[in-house]
Amino acid sequence: MGQKIHPYGYRVGITQPHSARWFANTYQYPQYVFEDFLLRQSLFKNLPVENLPRKRTEDKSETKLVQIKIERLIRNTIKIKLYVTSPENASELFEHEALTKSPKKDFGTTNSNKRNLQTNLESKKDRNTLRLNIQKRLLNKKLLQLQILKLQNMQSKLVTMKNLLDGSQNTNKKVFSSSVFVQKNETETIVNNYPFYLNNIAINYSIGKTLIEGIKDCLNMNLDGKKKVKYLFYFLQLKKQLSKTLLYQLDVYQKVEKQKLVNFTGLNKSEEQISAFQNTINLRLFKLKALSLKWTNHSRHLTNVLVSIQSKLTLELETLVSKLDQNKTNLNQKCATLINILKFKYMLRKNNFNKLELFVLNQKIEEIKLKWFQSLTIAGTVQAETDSQSDFYSSKKILLELNMISCEKQKMLTLLTKFKFSLNFYNTHLEKTKRIILAGLFLLSKFGWKKEIFNGLNTFLSQSVLIIKKLETHLGKNYKILQERIIVKINHMTILESTIKQNLNLLQILKIAQDHNTNRDKIKVSQLYKNLFKVFYLTSLSSTPAFHETLTNKTFLYDLVSESLDKYALLISQKVINLNSSLICYSEEKTTQIPVYNDKFLNILTREYLSNLIRLFKNDSINYYKSKALYQFSLALLNQRYKLNKIIEMKIKNLLLQIKPEEKTKNTFLVSIRDLNISLKSNTLFIKQLETWLTLLKKKLTENTATNRYLLQARIHKINCYLKKIIPVKITENNLVSTIEKNFIFVNYNILKQKLLAELLQMQQTIILAKKEEWEKEESLSFPPSTSFFTKTNISIGNLNQTLQILQNRILDLQGRFNQENQQKTAGKTVNTDLSPILQVENKTNVSKTLQLKTTLQQLLKTNYENSFIVLQTRRQVYNSIINRLGGHRKFGKSRAGEKENIWKNPYETAEYLDFKLKKVNNSTDTNSLTTLLETIKQKIYERKPIKLMYTRKQKFLAKKTIKKKLKHFLVLMALKNNYTNLSSLKNIYDVKTFAKLCENLTNLQTMPKVSVIELVKVHQPKQYAVCLANFVVENLEKRFSFRSTMKRASEQAMSTANVKGIKIQISGRLNGAEIARTEWLRDGVVPLQTLRANIDYSYKTAKTIYGILGVKVWLFKDTPANMNS
């Protein structure tokens, strides 16, 4: 890389890379140097240069220029590489209209420039209109989104009202879940979770069917009238539930079909296909509607029948009440009638009851049963008559045991109370004696002079005081000991009672599951459900309905039950497993299928269980007291797991101590130890999961929702205030851009406001539901809450349902429109052929960051190209070379030049007048003629070349190259002569009239500079570049810093990077204002300037000081080849 003096007086280094030298001539170098100089000068002037080290105040995300590399391709196309820090924010630098100001022209603009200006103005207008249209579309889309959010918030408010109006918690849950379901685009969720819904419906349907079959068998048997009415009532209720499930299923099918139609119309299909598909779906919908109408009528009929049966049951209840009033002597009959009354009440008012009322009613039934059995034992009526009734009497015995335990409990309590009364009695008497002793002591003090009379009294009083003290201490100790022991015994009894109750319920369930062949046990559905209800109540965790749903959805529960069991056994085992009280494990032998209790009933709590808990926990319907119960239950579980860990560790230690050297025993011990290790690992994993779950629950319990609510309200208030300020009352219609901008601001802030309102409504829903449940708890004993609430409000649930349906339809329509607009946008991106050229230009401007920079640099080169002296010289030389190549002459006289310009035609126009028909025929007939011609031409060329030039390998290669070129030229001429019909199309290649114009076009192609690409390369470490270090040294020298300190600092900065192996800095000039100029240099590390392979980065800069110019040179030796991206 040598240096040349520029004609304008600048010293410029030739920056032409080696790749350009293969096709560029030497006379083009001055032009390249001049262009490089212009580009570098403009870029370094207008872009901020990287300077090290950066100050603390400076923003490190700012884009700064490190280095420029200019590469040239064929026909003077320029590629510029800009090495920049943080190129992500580079678009801010290139937003200016022009980086460089072109010099002013004294002469006026030409016609071509005027036309260009007109076209630019037209294109700008088109762009503005296009931008306005795009902004309008976006605004419409945002408005749709705002409408959807508003409607969803309205819907959530109405849903909360409905939840308050509904009586039971189950309806609350259903409505609440449905509202959430609607908010998430109901149809899309149904289509996505289509198999899941079908599975749930199928499970419910199968359970209902099996129960109906069992009750049908029961009705066919010879039973009493009362029992038949009871079973009919159950049968009709189940039928009604089944019809509801079927109607829901039909509704799901309809929604799915509608969604299919919407999706099919969205695709790019023909009208015939769409119409055919529409017809098929319409037929399906018609059938589904007919079925739904049929089932609705059926459900109405069932409700009417149920009302009539209910009236009959009420009459029977009245008769039983009258019987109870009449019966005053027989206690057994009285208890039986009381149980029947309570059962009828339970049946009739099951749907309207609160959970607490149901529990109280069940407890009353149990108490009456206990009294009844007690009376039976006193009478001596309980006797085992047959083997079939043995189980029944065993259950009675268990009940008697329970009664005995409760009696003993009562006795203990009475003992404690009696002792308490006796203690109080003794205390009162002791106080009286104390008063008498005090009176005696008072007398002694008064009549102390008569010692003979009161001598014995003194000793008596002292003895009595000591006795009273002993009595008090003994009584206190006895009471404490008795109280502790009795309380401990009572606690043991209560635990025993609860375990016996649970076992009894589970035994009854297992009895029905085991004896599935007998008809009696198969039919006792009511018994089964009572027992299940008791077990369900005993377990604290299973009280949450969402947990029950999550477990029933799992399919692995069905695998635990063997295939040979009946439908009822499967249902019962599923229920028992879901309740998580104990796990039924059947023996491995297929012949004997006996249920066995598994002690490790907590094995059901797997990882999936915890994930389901977390999903349940996210649900808003979960309340504070429920989460508290969950927390307590999980804490107990964790303690159990810790104990289990300790037990396993102890077992492993014992086994290790018991291992013997014998092979037989050793293997068994090793296997058992391995199994225990596996169980220990699984247990530790489960403990970790439980701990995470407990932390989540603790957060839920401790978090304060009130603060979040207040924050949301404050944010909404701020948004309202801002909107009132920013939007004026009157908007000007002339300025469209400003109006659209204001509308955008208004809509965006309103969308944000609606989202915040949705969050606030969700919080309020949870609070309202929690308060409702508390209120129900408080007032459940006095009167049912649902009736009292309905009396206060005039709103009906029917009207609410209608309004919710209307809102839902409206939301679905708006969401469909919104989705269609999104689909159109995606389709517009894929299809590029329909776009106009203006839109294509708009897209390009969005994609490329450096388009504006490229255009400004191109204009700069164009203006300097027209006026510079160096470009004219290179242009003249290129022009002359083209003329010589095409066979023209450089200098002509006036007459000859005019003749040349008038006579000259395209080289292919002369071929039209020649007759090539004979040649064409000869070439087509003789296939070997072309090969022979080529061989002869080759021989002629070889003969022309001297023999001396054919010695070396290189000379042979060059000779072959020239031969190939000449043969190609010959073949082209042959092809033109043979295909004389295509000569007219070849005329358009050179669309010029004169020879001079053709030469000008070719010179423009070769010499006119064109900026093709501007590539931005990210620089991670600017310390690795010599340019940055040189800039740093120059800046410090200009600020009058000492040159040695600046050199040291620059070398430290460079050597701190791993890539740099060595640095050399040289400063020459009047250093520190000395009269004689000198050079100072500093070297750190290795800088091998003589080796060609060494990767050395060099830069030269000048510092302009008061005493003159100082030259700064920096050499950097890098370990690896230059890689700007590293």
UniProtKB/Swiss-Prot annotation:
Q: Which UniProt keywords apply?
A: Chloroplast, Plastid, Ribonucleoprotein, Ribosomal protein
Q: Name any GO cellular component annotation.
A: chloroplast
UniProt entry tagged with the keyword Plastid: yes
Q: Give the source species.
A: Stigeoclonium helveticum
Please give the residue ranges the record annotates as the region Insert. Answer: 89-881, 943-1013
Q: Name the family.
A: Belongs to the universal ribosomal protein uS3 family.
Give a Pfam family name.
Ribosomal_S3_C
> What assembly does the database describe for this protein?
Part of the 30S ribosomal subunit.
Domain of life (superkingdom): Eukaryota
Q: Does the keyword Plastid apply?
A: yes
Q: Which compartment or compartments is the protein found in? A: Plastid, Chloroplast
Under the heading InterPro entries, the entry gives: KH_dom-like_a/b, KH_sf_prok-type, Ribosomal_S3_C_sf, Ribosomal_uS3_bac-typ, Ribosomal_uS3_C, Ribosomal_uS3_CS
Its name, as the record gives it, is Small ribosomal subunit protein uS3c
* GO molecular-function term, one example from the UniProt record: RNA binding
Gene Ontology biological process terms from the UniProt entry:
translation
Question: Which gene is annotated as encoding this protein in its UniProt record?
Answer: rps3
